[in-house]
């Protein structure tokens, strides 16, 4: 599914329109001295919903980062969505990061599962199991399974996903959006080699998150 994203994500258009109208009205009534906080708010909303194009690495076995942010976990963990032991890499997004999600690999969507939940701080490990989340399980052409989980955060209360089971995904393709501070967990096959470390800042699509193992 090719979901068209302009440089300002369309998820943000209503918020930008509302912020702009409020700023204009207050400016018209009270001048810039009264309206400047609302112009500042408009600038923040526009930067939050920015969605710039990114360079996409072509390395065949690369798993690309699905979101902008900071690495908060690199560990062996159980993937409950594909029922396996896996390498788990987690990316935390603060309110200043781009909040669109992009496919980490080329492949076909095996399933999409939504789970209601809490809205804990997404930087916490327990957010992976307790927060509202949406899992997309992808099968690559080489037979690997990659799971990408969108997780709502303390402020984020809306997960958007634009793909369904059976649809193809291309690496770097935009497939979802989380509003206002969140997290993405990626589960990879055992034997995958992480290319990032905890605390590292990463960029969606242009950062290589890990390398998949060769199929036997």
Swiss-Prot record:
It catalyses: a 1,2-diacyl-sn-glycero-3-phospho-L-serine + H(+) = a 1,2-diacyl-sn-glycero-3-phosphoethanolamine + CO2. The modification Pyruvic acid (Ser) is found at residue 182. Is synthesized initially as an inactive proenzyme. Formation of the active enzyme involves a self-maturation process in which the active site pyruvoyl group is generated from an internal serine residue via an autocatalytic post-translational modification. Two non-identical subunits are generated from the proenzyme in this reaction, and the pyruvate is formed at the N-terminus of the alpha chain, which is derived from the carboxyl end of the proenzyme. GO terms for biological process: phosphatidylethanolamine biosynthetic process. Its cofactor is pyruvate. The record marks 181-182 as: Cleavage (non-hydrolytic). It comes from the Bacteria. GO terms for cellular component: plasma membrane. It is found in: Cell membrane. This is Phosphatidylserine decarboxylase proenzyme. It comes from Burkholderia thailandensis (strain ATCC 700388 / DSM 13276 / CCUG 48851 / CIP 106301 / E264). The gene is psd.
């Amino acid at each position: 599914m090719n979901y068209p994203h302009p440089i300002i994500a369309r998820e943000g258009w209503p918020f930008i329109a509302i912020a702009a109208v409020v700023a204009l009205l207050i400016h018209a009534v009270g001048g810039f001295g009264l309206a400047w906080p609302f112009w500042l708010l408009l600038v923040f909303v526009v930067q939050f919903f920015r969605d710039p194009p990114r360079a996409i690495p072509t390395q065949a076995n690369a798993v690309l980062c699905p979101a902008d942010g900071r690495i908060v976990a690199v560990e062996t963990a159980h993937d409950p969505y594909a029922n396996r032991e896996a390498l788990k890499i987690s990316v935390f997004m603060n309110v200043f990061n781009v909040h669109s999600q992009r496919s980490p690999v080329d492949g076909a969507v095996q399933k999409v599962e939504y789970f209601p939940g809490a809205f804990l701080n997404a930087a916490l490990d327990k957010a992976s199991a307790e927060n509202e989340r949406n899992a997309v399980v992808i099968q690559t052409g080489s037979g690997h399974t990659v799971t990408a989980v969108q997780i709502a955060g303390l402020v984020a209360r809306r997960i958007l996903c634009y793909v369904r089971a059976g649809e193809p995904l291309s690496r770097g393709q935009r497939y979802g959006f989380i509003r206002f501070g969140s997290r993405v967990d990626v589960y990879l096959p055992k034997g995958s080699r992480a290319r990032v470390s905890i605390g590292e800042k990463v960029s969606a699509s242009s950062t290589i998150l890990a390398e998949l193992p060769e199929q036997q």
